[in-house]
Design a protein with these regions (language model features):
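Extended, domain-scale alpha-helical bundle/helix-rich regions
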Residues: 233-245
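Metal-assisted phosphate- and nucleotidyl-transfer catalytic regions
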Residues: 165-166, 170, 244-340, 363-376, ...
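Alpha-helix capping and helix-loop boundary segments enriched in small/acidic/polar residues
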Residues: 181, 214-215, 233, 271-274, ...
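TRNA-recognition modules of translation machinery and tRNA-sensing kinases, especially anticodon-binding
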Residues: 197, 201-204, 216, 224-234, ...
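Class II aminoacyl-tRNA synthetase-like tRNA-binding/catalytic domains
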Residues: 2-231, 397
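Hydrophobic alpha-helix position signal
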Residues: 147, 194, 284-287, 361
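Extended, non-catalytic structural segments that build the interaction scaffolds
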Residues: 131-135, 267-272, 345
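Short coil/turn segments at secondary-structure boundaries
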Residues: 102-105, 136, 156-160, 204-207, ...
Length: 420
């Protein structure tokens, strides 16, 4: 079936298009079928004097959201949704939609988020919802292009593991034949091992799983993480890489996603780099919390309102960061990238000395013998390295001003939702 997408239609040509019945309108002497494809809504115009009455009756019988194919002549019509109309000479019903519909995809009757997620296949037909995922695809494509252009190699790491990557109990256990395993909470250990392998610069875009019982607008249990690790770079250099990536993504989305952004009513403000750096000590002073406390939602909000732009928090207490972060007295070479609304990424200069790593594992109450496969990589020539992990969903939420992180995922997994 050779079809023309609505965005590629040229006036005064014969075309064949296909899509969903968006709306039907009958004004007596003229009828309209609004047909929707991925690119937008097309106006199919049926004047009684130009279109056979049996074809008009056939179109009038169509149910909303039925799938149809239309062949006809394109005419310029500036009042039509995309500046043209199609005078049909053939309308074929490909599949009829049942009634009533689970959602109103015209946007005239709004549904709550849970109802939309329950009927997600319908919800994505809404222009504003579809726009989120067109932009998401652009963001992830540009992340890959940006890192590949800087000599990073894309890798894929295991999502089923035998032990915790970063310690703690935030793991989903699974049955792995005759023994217990877990869904991986981070590719951290594996991307570090690739530094010992000599790949030098790697990245991964893939799912991670956190068994956290949060039920908030900014937490999910399955997340798309953008992870980077680089040999012979320090924390400052990978921070620069991260802020350059963020700016690049904003610029590219603004340039290439004008229609989806318009559907969302969003005008992007491009962040300026370098981002501001503040020490943990300054952050807790702004938030009025004691030394040694992590920043909770209220603290993040207080600091975000003060800074009012993207910023890094640096000079963290070593006790608040994972075992693989390079310590510096009672501090460490770690950083968090923050948006005024929430944390976006965390990273650090890593430990590359095996003896220190074993010491840090024990200090975090983790058994070094459970990390033998990982520690081996540090015994035979591990270079200095640094890296970070960036949440794709949080990047989208803050970029587009979405109210809930679930809006940025086709089928979110949270504390309550495991279907569809």
């Amino acid at each position: 079936m050779k079809l023309t997408r609505s965005s590629a239609i040229v006036p005064d040509t014969d075309v064949t298009v296909a899509g969903w019945v968006h709306e039907l309108r009958d004004l007596g002497g003229i009828s309209f079928l609004l047909l929707r494809d991925r690119d937008g809504v097309m106006q199919i115009t049926m004047p009684k004097k130009k279109v056979p009455p049996e074809l008009v009756e056939h179109v009038r019988s169509l149910s909303r959201e039925s799938v149809v194919r239309v062949a006809g002549l394109v005419k310029e019509e500036l009042k039509a949704p995309q500046g043209f109309e199609i005078i049909p000479y053939e309308v074929e019903l490909l599949n009829a939609a049942e009634s009533p519909l689970p959602l109103d995809v015209t946007g005239k009757v709004r549904a709550d988020l849970d109802t939309r997620l329950d009927a997600r296949f319908m919800d994505v037909r809404l222009p504003a919802t579809r726009a989120i995922f067109l932009i998401r695809a652009t963001v992830l494509r540009e992340v890959r292009a940006f890192l590949s252009a800087r000599d990073f190699i894309e890798i894929q790491t295991p999502k089923m593991v035998a032990t915790a990557t970063e310690g703690g109990t935030q793991l989903f256990p699974i049955s792995y034949f005759d023994r217990e395993a877990f869904l991986n909470q981070s590719p951290q250990l594996y991307k570090q091992m690739m530094m010992a392998a000599g790949l030098e610069r790697v990245f991964e875009v893939g799912p991670i799983f956190r068994a956290e019982e949060h039920d908030t607008r900014k937490h999910l249990n399955e997340i798309t993480s953008i992870d980077v690790e680089a040999s012979f770079l320090d924390d400052h250099e990978v921070m620069e890489l991260l802020e350059e990536l963020i700016q690049h993504v904003y610029v590219t989305v603004a340039e290439r996603c004008s229609a989806p952004l318009q559907s969302l009513g969003v005008t992007l403000s491009i962040p300026h780099i370098p981002f501001k750096r503040i020490a943990y000590a300054e952050a807790i002073e702004i938030a009025d919390i004691p030394w040694g406390d992590d920043l909770d939602t209220a603290a993040e909000k207080a600091v975000g309102e003060e800074i009012a732009e993207h910023y890094f928090i640096v000079d963290w207490p070593a006790e608040l960061k994972p075992f693989y972060v390079q310590p510096r007295n009672n501090l460490c070479y770690a950083f968090d990238l923050m948006h005024p609304r929430m944390e976006l990424a965390s990273g650090a200069r890593r430990i590359h000395d095996c003896a220190l790593l074993v010491e840090q594992l024990a200090g975090k109450s983790l058994a070094p013998e459970n990390f033998g496969f990982y520690l081996d990589a540090f015994r035979f020539g591990m270079p200095p390295h640094a890296g970070w992990g960036l949440g794709a969903e949080r990047l989208l939420v803050t970029m587009l001003g979405l109210a809930n992180i679930r809006e940025s995922v086709l089928f979110p997994r949270d504390r309550r939702r495991i279907t569809p």
